[in-house]
């Protein structure tokens, strides 16, 4: 599937302006996500409850407040917060060129790719090659989602990486950990260097490492699907007093067998016997049939789509 751009930008340095498209460098859709379900298998909704009254608060009536003292807030309206936001701009202004290795990776935030847009191929390639030759990267300002961000534009073999950076106050200092530095002997250091040399590789190969936990979860999901340990949302409206799903289906079969002695369901709207509360609607909608419907457990298991 072709990559989809998330923004059209203009990378500006000096009198040169490069039209580019922005792409996310990571794939969040590959994550394994679970839904929260009620005991009957239906989805649940999140509600916000007032701590003072216990009443449900609708999102449309909520306010935003900053707690400056315990249980004391200053409240802002949506318009007040909007006025404080930075105006979004498609122009990414390069403000400096610095050695690429001078940025500690601890400041790396979200990573993007940028690719040339129409008529941007030559200046894009020029910037990519110039950065690679110089061993430098570009620092730029980018106004997005109401906030100005600092980004690093660095070259790679295939193009330019657009790396969002954290601000200084977003990164903790290791000095706060008060790490004690202990002297080591020359022989200890030599032995450690030998161990490092023994395990040295030329480069990092991402394909050599896998998310083992994700693999175990996906395998467990497949086993449950193949074993038909599946809760269907189609029966989420059945009252709880009907019992477990398997008991409910047995009761339905029994009701159909008992009703066949009296009169087959010639009129689809006629009520069938109701040994289990709440089953009248389920039997009323069935077409006349000489045999019981298949149990959901007999249906082929759904195959989980993998990306």
Swiss-Prot record:
Residues 11-179 form the Ku domain. Pfam families: Ku (PF02735). Residues 257-307 are annotated as: Disordered. Gene3D superfamilies: 2.40.290.10. GO terms for biological process: DNA recombination; double-strand break repair via nonhomologous end joining. Belongs to the prokaryotic Ku family. HAMAP family: Prokaryotic_Ku. Homodimer. Interacts with LigD. This is Non-homologous end joining protein Ku. It comes from Paraburkholderia phymatum (strain DSM 17167 / CIP 108236 / LMG 21445 / STM815). The gene is ku.
């Amino acid at each position: 599937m072709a990559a989809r751009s998330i923004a059209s930008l203009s990378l500006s340095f000096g009198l040169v302006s490069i039209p580019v498209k922005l792409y996310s460098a990571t794939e969040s859709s590959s994550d394994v996500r679970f839904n929260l379900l009620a005991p009957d298998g239906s989805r649940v909704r999140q509600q916000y409850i007032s701590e003072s009254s216990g009443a449900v608060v609708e999102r449309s009536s909520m306010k935003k407040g900053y707690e400056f003292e315990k249980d004391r807030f200053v409240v802002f309206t949506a318009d007040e917060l909007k006025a404080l936001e930075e105006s979004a701009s498609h122009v990414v202004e390069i403000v400096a060129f610095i050695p690429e290795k001078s940025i500690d990776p601890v400041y790396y935030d979200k990573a993007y790719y940028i690719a040339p847009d129409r008529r941007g191929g030559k200046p894009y390639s020029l910037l990519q090659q110039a950065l690679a030759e110089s061993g430098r990267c570009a620092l730029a300002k980018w106004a997005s989602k109401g906030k100005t961000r600092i980004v690093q534009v660095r070259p790679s073999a295939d193009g330019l990486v657009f790396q969002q950076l954290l601000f200084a106050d977003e990164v903790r200092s290791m000095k706060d950990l008060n790490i004690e530095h202990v002297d080591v002997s020359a022989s200890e250091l030599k032995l450690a260097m030998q161990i490092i040399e023994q395990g040295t590789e030329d480069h990092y190969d991402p394909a050599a490492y896998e998310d083992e936990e994700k693999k175990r979860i996906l395998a467990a999901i497949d086993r449950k699907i193949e074993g038909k340990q599946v809760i269907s949302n189609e029966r989420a409206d059945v009252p709880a007093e009907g019992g477990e799903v398997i008991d409910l289906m047995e009761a339905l079969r029994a009701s159909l067998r008992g009703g066949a002695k009296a009169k087959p369901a010639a009129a689809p709207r006629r009520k069938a016997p109701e040994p289990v509360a709440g089953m009248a609607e389920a039997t009323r909608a069935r077409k006349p049939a000489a045999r019981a419907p298949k149990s959901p457990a007999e249906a082929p298991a759904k195959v989980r789509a993998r990306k």
